[in-house]
């Protein structure tokens, strides 16, 4: 069972309330989006156990970025939270042992701007990595090797300051988990391999933290995982067996909330999001203005 919450800092709320009172209002109008577990092959038996207050709306389990949504007029600061439970299942895959079908599907192979962009540099890199290879499994493996063996984990500024996170990663050879995942997705799509985004939390008894990873599709097996930042970590540790494990597989300690990058919320957030690409900790809008950074406090723990 996970417990998660989001709220304004007291200082942020005080400033917002003072501005509202200067306009003749005694409350601030707040909209909140908090991530919830979404339906996917690795996640089932999802139960929303409790909320700090009944949400105005709960997005369906199939939403690309699933959230609980609250809308309220606040005279006092408060937090918006949820407790939920789910079953996490790891489906083992051995892509390097499979025989790929001669004809592969073409869904999830298009550009998805601004970050899944087929720039000249990315197209040239994909061509170089897959030159002489016809097997889609080996193409995906070459791309995974490039990311995990060449890109160094590096904390990133908020993604909204980047024009294109994937081209920048391929050139600088630096990125965090989301940048690595998006770079893998972009190169796979250029090579004709269906690939997509998945993200949420790493949820362990002792800790919980944000994480992003990728999925790729090879017929007849179907969707498999590529956790490039975990693979890069194993490469740094000299653990080749585990680096290869994350080409096709995930651990069971994941809470999946998002199945697409840069997807709108349901209902949509009309102001600028703190993270327009992803949603791992939630978003708050106060009187039509989105909050970010130190204006917001979040929690996530295993209970």
Q: How should these model regions be labeled?
A:
Residues 47-52, 96-105, 228-231:
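Short intrinsically disordered coil segments
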Residues 1-90:
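Intrinsically disordered, low-complexity N-terminal segments that are enriched in acidic
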Residues 59-69, 73-171:
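Acidic low-complexity segments
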Residues 136-143, 173-188:
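Active-site nucleophilic cysteine motif
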Residues 44-45, 92-93, 235-240:
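A short, polar/proline- and glycine-enriched secondary-structure boundary/capping micro-motif
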Residues 32, 143, 214:
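Terminal peptide-recognition signature
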Residues 179-269:
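Hydrophobic/aromatic-rich core segments of domains that either
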Residues 248-303:
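Low-complexity, Gly/Ser/Thr/Pro-rich intrinsically disordered linker/tail segments
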């Amino acid at each position: 069972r996970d417990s998660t919450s989001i709220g304004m800092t007291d200082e942020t709320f005080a400033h917002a309330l003072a501005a509202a009172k200067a306009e003749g209002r005694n409350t601030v109008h707040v909209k909140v989006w908090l991530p919830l577990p979404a339906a996917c092959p690795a996640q089932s038996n999802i139960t929303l156990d409790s909320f700090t207050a009944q949400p105005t709306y709960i997005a369906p389990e199939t939403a690309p970025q699933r959230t609980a949504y609250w809308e309220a007029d606040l005279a006092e600061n408060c937090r918006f939270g949820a407790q939920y439970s789910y079953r996490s299942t790891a489906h083992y895959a051995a892509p390097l042992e499979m025989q790929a079908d001669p004809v592969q599907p073409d869904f999830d192979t298009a550009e998805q701007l601004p970050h899944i962009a087929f720039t000249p540099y990315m197209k040239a890199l994909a061509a170089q990595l897959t030159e002489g290879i016809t097997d889609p499994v080996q193409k995906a493996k070459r791309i995974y090797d490039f990311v995990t063996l060449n890109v160094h984990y590096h904390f990133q500024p908020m993604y909204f300051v980047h024009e294109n996170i994937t081209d920048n990663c391929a050139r600088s050879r630096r990125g965090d988990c989301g940048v690595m995942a998006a770079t893998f997705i972009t190169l796979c799509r250029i090579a004709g391999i269906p690939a997509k985004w998945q993200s949420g939390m790493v949820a362990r008894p002792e800790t919980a933290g944000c994480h992003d990873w990728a999925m790729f599709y090879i017929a007849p097996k179907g969707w498999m995982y590529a956790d490039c930042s975990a693979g890069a970590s194993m490469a740094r540790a000299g653990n080749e067996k585990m680096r290869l494990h994350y080409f096709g597989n995930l651990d069971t300690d994941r809470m999946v909330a998002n199945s697409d990058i840069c997807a709108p919320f349901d209902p949509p957030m009309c102001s600028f999001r703190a993270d327009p690409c992803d949603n791992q900790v939630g978003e708050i809008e106060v009187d039509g203005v989105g909050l970010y950074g130190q204006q917001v406090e979040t929690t996530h723990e295993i209970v």
